């Protein structure tokens, strides 16, 4: 599987092709408790998962997986049915609190699974 990694961390960014897990992990750890994004794109998939993006600000994380299903582009995200629908601002956009993750180890688990398998279990991102 061929990936590209792109990021913005506190206003400065970059990208690289064919990252190793260490490259992804370094950017992910840098994202912890600051504002920015990390995106992993899969280059050789015509259907199924295409990309995983993490948006972060103030210890709040929004994780989205984009995929092609039956010629439609769909986005899967974390959903906490026990949380409120109150809106949280991340990078200037407002998102329902029930889609926000505050557990950094969960964010790490999701991006690791995507990097190593090319997908994320639907019980993690629905």
Language model: regions and residue ranges:
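Acidic, proline/glycine-rich low-complexity IDRs
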Residues: 1-33, 44-49, 60, 64-126
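A short, Trp-centered hydrophobic/proline-enriched beta-strand micro-motif
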Residues: 36-42
